[in-house]
Curated annotation (Swiss-Prot):
Signal peptide: none annotated. Residues 613-646 form a coiled coil. Residues 57-141 form the RRM domain. Keywords: Coiled coil, Cytoplasm, Initiation factor, Protein biosynthesis, Repeat, RNA-binding, WD repeat. The gene is eIF3b. PANTHER family: EUKARYOTIC TRANSLATION INITIATION FACTOR 3 EIF3 -RELATED, EUKARYOTIC TRANSLATION INITIATION FACTOR 3 SUBUNIT B. GO terms for biological process: follicle cell of egg chamber development; formation of cytoplasmic translation initiation complex; regulation of translational initiation. HAMAP family: eIF3b. Residues 1-33 are annotated as: Disordered. It is found in: Cytoplasm. It comes from the Eukaryota. This is Eukaryotic translation initiation factor 3 subunit B. Residues 1-11 have a biased composition (Basic and acidic residues). Its main location: cytoplasm.
């Protein structure tokens, strides 16, 4: 082609000496190319379609039991039941030796490749029993491992990321607590501010726009704060609240931390119900997942106090999983016919559960020691409609609120059951005493609320009519029945909030927004009765020194914000914040001091008073100085603005005189001003008199 084009051009203009002939790229005769297609087009050839060999839907299951022919059918039944949960099984082959004994592995073909991948994901490392743990792989993995390059290339060294101190918030020399405030700036867009509760004014630490889509939540020890997003959740921590870890679980609606902050549980919707995933917080790895049957599964897991066990309730059973493997304890569930609820002790590996009445068998509350699964106490109950389990924070007592009935009315089909003549019992288990004695308190009125004193031996009950209820305080002592120590009558409260340190309690009406602060060691005197209209939440700080009440925009759309009070009910500050949604104090980890050291400090507390008083005086002096400096700065700013406007007013004098008929009105005396009164008709009314 190049030669032909050159000839045509020469014929057209033979005298054109500037024309250069195009180069000829043809290979010489007999030339053989020595480069292969793989070397030349390797990346393209790797993407070309290949003929399927039909093994994409086949999995290989290793580490299976080696059984005799007589036991093969039973093994097949167990394996098919387990793997059929992942999809339709087309064919299964169990290779056998010369004696007919299985070789410990099997080939399993599913209907689709996606079902095979799901089987690998769900059942790889599945523990069949204490001797056998499955190793499930795709058959196509053999081809992948055959093509491993012979020359080993070391992995690229990743740069070390220095993580900030996650516990810096407890190193403050004055022990100021922190809190976060969330406000919705747009739909699915929440601004979160982090503050330190310093005196006289709080100190802003950090403010993040669009920090979360819905709300935030602190971990139990205050190390992390979790945020919610469409792809999943993330946890943040450190001095500047850096991202520590993220957990991909689309549509997560709720999360739970384990008590020691080793694990995180996320709850998110699926087309068939709820999916629950348990994550390792430090590595971000998924430890185990479950599928629930609806919204009722929120908070379905219960953790032991030391993170060694996590439990959930099944049909007539409790499933207890060991960490970190998350296998069932002893590889089987605990069968309990008629179980209706359970709860862990906050300080010991003891589970309390209750079962309903069945076939003339009374209801029962049982305490079980884990991992021995040994029942350490039983209590039979009669005519039971419902039970609620309330552990005291220190684990010293368990209260079982029993809803009892006098008569039971059923329809003909026994589908609709009505309980008549309701009354209530409080069964108090003394956990620290020998053989765990049980005391009972009976109340014949409607129970509105119950709350234990976190550190102490008292509990409080709201009972009676909602608008005119009574609040009773009981004291529990060793060897005697719980005694009524005080009853406050005709109160309109609906909720009880004890101080984390005990002694003080807030009786709140979260419908009307009224609060009463009570000191339970000073003859139960009401020290203050503030109100916060439409308040929907009450939050004690971890030290029991401050209380916050909040009006959230989730409840109302106007006058949202929060108030802060002392433990005696004295108002400290009021904050009005548009679209305020949440206020949360940052939790504190338990003290590292022994009980003996704490007692010693309390005993010698008087010698620390002068130090604290001196700090208070310095703080007040510093606060006064800062206040004076702030006022001086405001005055200086105002005077600067005033002088600027006066200068502008003087520059406009000639313009004013011209507009006012060449009369200088700036220097007019009041005596020279004529006052003229003008009257005009505004309205006329006619009234007919009979």
């Amino acid at each position: 082609m190049a030669k032909k084009k050159s000839e045509e051009h020469s014929g057209a203009d033979a005298n054109d000496s500037d024309y250069n002939e195009e180069p000829n790229f043809d290979d010489p005769p007999g030339y053989v190319d020595n480069i292969s297609d793989e070397d030349l087009l390797g990346d393209m050839l790797a993407q070309r379609p290949s003929e399927a060999d039909g093994v994409e839907s086949v999995v290989v299951v290793d580490n299976m039991p080696k059984v005799e022919p007589s036991r093969l059918e039973k093994l097949k039944s167990v394996i098919n039941k387990l793997f059929s949960q992942c999809g339709e099984i087309v064919n299964v082959v169990y290779p056998v030796d010369e004696e007919g004994k299985t070789k410990g592995y099997a080939f399993m073909e599913f209907k689709t490749a996606s079902q095979a991948e799901d089987a690998v994901k769900k059942l790889n490392n599945h523990r069949l029993d204490k001797n056998y743990t499955f190793a499930v792989n795709l058959f196509t993995d053999f081809q992948k491992y055959e093509n491993i390059p012979e020359k080993w290339e070391p992995p690229t060294v990743q740069p070390f990321k220095v993580q900030s101190d996650l516990y810096n918030f407890i190193n403050d020399p004055d022990a100021y607590d922190q809190y976060c405030v969330a406000a919705e700036t747009a739909p699915n867009c929440v601004q979160v501010g982090f503050w330190q509760n310093t005196l006289p004014e709080p100190n802003e630490l950090e403010t993040r726009e669009r920090f979360t889509d819905t709300f935030v939540k602190w971990s139990p020890l205050g190390t992390y704060v979790v945020t919610f997003h469409k792809p999943g959740v993330a946890i943040w921590g450190g001095s500047s609240f850096q991202k520590i870890q993220k957990f991909p679980h689309p549509g997560t609606q709720f999360v739970e931390f384990s008590p020691c902050e080793n694990y995180l549980v996320t709850y998110g919707p699926t087309p068939t119900g709820q999916k629950i995933i348990i994550w390792d917080i430090r590595t971000g790895a998924e430890k185990r997942s479950f599928v629930g049957d609806g919204m009722s599964v929120l908070s379905m897991f219960r953790w032991s106090h030391d993170d060694k066990f996590v439990a959930r309730m099944g049909e007539n059973s409790i499933h207890i999983y060991e960490t970190p493997s998350f296998y069932l304890l002893d590889l089987k569930s605990i069968k309990i016919a008629g179980i209706r609820g359970f709860s862990w002790s906050p300080t010991d590996n003891v589970i309390a559960y209750w079962v309903e009445e069945q076939n003339q068998i009374p209801a029962r509350v049982t305490l079980m020691e884990i991992p021995k699964k040994r029942e350490i106490r039983n209590k039979n109950l009669f005519h039971v409609a419902d039970c609620k389990l309330h552990w005291q924070k220190s684990g010293d007592y368990l209260c079982v609120k029993v809803d009892r009935y006098s008569k039971l009315k059923k329809d003909k089909k026994e589908l609709d059951v009505k309980f008549l003549g309701m009354f209530y019992n409080f069964e108090i288990f003394h956990m620290r005493e020998k053989e765990i004695p049980v005391d009972s308190v009976e109340i014949r009125e409607l129970i509105l609320a119950f709350a234990w004193e976190p550190i102490g031996n008292k509990f409080s009950i709201i009972h009676g009519e909602p608008n005119s209820a009574n609040v009773s305080f009981y004291e529990v002592n060793k060897g005697v029945k719980p005694s009524l120590v005080k009853r406050l009558e005709k109160k309109s409260c609906t909720h009880l909030f004890w101080s984390p340190r005990g002694q003080f309690i807030v009786m709140a009406n979260l419908t009307m927004g009224t609060f009463e602060f009570v000191d339970t060691t000073n003859d139960y005197i009401i020290s203050a009765s503030p109100d916060h209209f439409r308040a929907s939440e009450v939050e004690w700080d971890p030290t029991g020194r401050y209380v916050v009440t909040g009006v959230s925009s989730w409840k109302v759309k106007e006058d949202t914000g929060f108030n802060m009070y002392t433990f005696q009910g004295r108002i400290i500050r009021r904050t009005i914040l548009k679209n305020f949604v949440q206020f949360l104090w940052r939790p504190r980890p338990p003290t590292l001091l022994s009980e003996e050291k704490q007692k010693e400090i309390k005993k010698n507390l008087k010698k620390y008073y002068p130090i604290f008083e001196q700090k208070d005086r310095l703080r007040l002096t510093r606060a006064s100085k800062e206040l004076l400096e702030k006022r001086a700065q405001l005055r200086e700013t105002f005077m600067e603005y005033r002088n600027k406007r006066i200068a502008e007013w003087k520059d406009q004098k000639s313009r004013r005189i011209m507009l006012r008929g060449h009369v200088d009105t700036d220097n007019l005396e009041t005596d020279e001003v004529d006052e003229e009164v003008v009257e005009f008709l505004v309205k006329e009314e006619v009234t007919l008199l009979e």
